[in-house]
Amino acid sequence: MAPPGQLLPLARSLLPLSAPPFVSGRRRRLPTLVLGRALPPPTWLPHGRLSPAHPLPFAPPRRLSRPPPPATSLPGASPGGGAEAQAVLAEFVTSERVKVAAMLGLALALCNADRVVMSVAIVPLSQAYGWTPSFAGVVQSSFLWGYLVSPIIGGALVDYYGGKRVMAYGVALWSLATFLSPWAAARSLWLFLSTRVLLGMAEGVALPSMNNMVLRWFPRTERSSAVGIAMAGFQLGNTIGLLLSPIIMSRAGIFGPFVIFGLFGFLWVLVWISAISGTPGENAQISAHELDYITRGQKLVKTQSGGERLRKVPPFSKLLSKWPTWALISANAMHSWGYFVILSWMPVYFKTIYHVNLREAAWFSALPWVMMAVLGYVAGVVSDRLIQNGTSITLTRKIMQTIGFVGPGVALLGLNAAKSPVIASAWLTIAVGLKSFGHSGFLVNLQEIAPQYAGVLHGMSNTAGTFAAILGTVGAGFFVDRMGSFRGFLILTSLLYFSSTLFWDIFATGERVDFDGTG
């Protein structure tokens, strides 16, 4: 150890700066280095303070005039908590893009309400006009005649003209068909059937238009939630149509729901045209922060109109040559099979299997659609949260679609074994609710593998879904006629769900697919 007399000089030699007076009465003048640059010796003031004229050896911290805005995200996706989460939620709820999603949800609610009102009206109409059950089935299926091809045409129109314009024309046209149904039925049966065909043709553009608007208005990390909001309206339309139509009929006659729902459609078109823009860049009310957030979250090639446009004939052969396309077609077909079988036959199922009256059967059949609306939004939030936390888009879509297929498949087997209508309704609610996870699977995936052809892809897969819906609806009746029970058909539907899950998990992808190249 150094002698005590040498400790003070040793300490002075180790100091990087000149020692202040309290170290020694004699001030040493050592050069001060700041980032490798020699500075002149500092001027020491009394009490050991540096002269203000002497530069500090580090840059003083800068104080921001205002903190940067938090990264906008969906409810549940904010990494912060407390006040920050509330601020993010408030910004999201009041944002322009949520207004778009809400209006899309209302449009899809009207779409389904106008569709299912015939399911309620078919009984009094058959009695009033003397229709046989077989002809009543023809009337019910007339909607699908128009719906069979229109999604392909509508998808191409959406890709070229944009979702706002096509959706406006679609809602106006199907509302007109609904509104004119009483007038047509009073004059000619074929004229009445024509209004149903027109309804199907017009509603074929609804889902492609919804996909196009979500693609333009939402960043990739929020699209599942946006689709969840829109599809919640779609499912609530079933509930609205099934539950309100009998009430309206009791007060305004058989055709009361047709007139009222048609008028609501015209009102929606007026609000849509005046309050909603085709793209964020065309919106005068959107904040600069929200516009920047949406733009940064998208990776699209912009045109002068602000969005992607399809300026050539879609390469159908190229689209059909890729396995991800067939994964989408298969998923949409299976989704539509189960959807229309449940929508068309479950009231009859409860009446024939459990011998409940029609009113109770309607309630048992309507409740699952409420669950589908709720879980559809939950699935969207969960899906977006997975992506925001680093899960790949491909894996996220496969997880969501697996739940959306395996869940209903297992629940339908439980429905097959149910001994009471309450237990059966519980299994049906589980089946329909979990089915909504597919909205964050194949339905969002359309926008990801080919955003420039999303409308056409939706139309192609939707047409396959319509064929499957017709086949499933007719097949259910065939099983009942030949086997006297729905049970065999429910088992078949479960097996189809499981096989479709396997096909999806093997061939689906969340990455963009090259449909324009030569490879």
UniProtKB/Swiss-Prot annotation:
Subcellular location per the Swiss-Prot or TrEMBL entry: Plastid, Chloroplast membrane
Membrane topology note: Multi-pass membrane protein
Transit peptide: 1-76
Keyword Transmembrane among record annotations: yes
Ranges annotated as biased composition (Pro residues): 56-72
Disulfide bonds: none
Keyword Manganese found: no
Region (Disordered): 56-82
Principal location listed in the UniProt entry: plastid
Pfam families: MFS_1 (PF07690)
GO cellular component: chloroplast membrane; plastid
SUPFAM superfamilies: MFS general substrate transporter
One biological process term in Gene Ontology: monoatomic ion transport
Keywords: Chloroplast, Ion transport, Membrane, Plastid, Transit peptide, Transmembrane, Transmembrane helix, Transport
Annotated GO MF terms: phosphate transmembrane transporter activity
Transmembrane segments: 100-120, 138-158, 166-186, 188-208, 229-249, 253-273, 326-346, 362-382, 403-423, 424-444, 460-480, 488-508
Family: Belongs to the major facilitator superfamily. Sodium/anion cotransporter (TC 2.A.1.14) family.
Function noted in UniProt: Probable anion transporter.
PANTHER family noted in UniProt: ANION TRANSPORTER 4, CHLOROPLASTIC-RELATED (PTHR11662:SF424), SOLUTE CARRIER FAMILY 17 (PTHR11662)
Protein name: Probable anion transporter 3, chloroplastic
Organism: Oryza sativa subsp. japonica
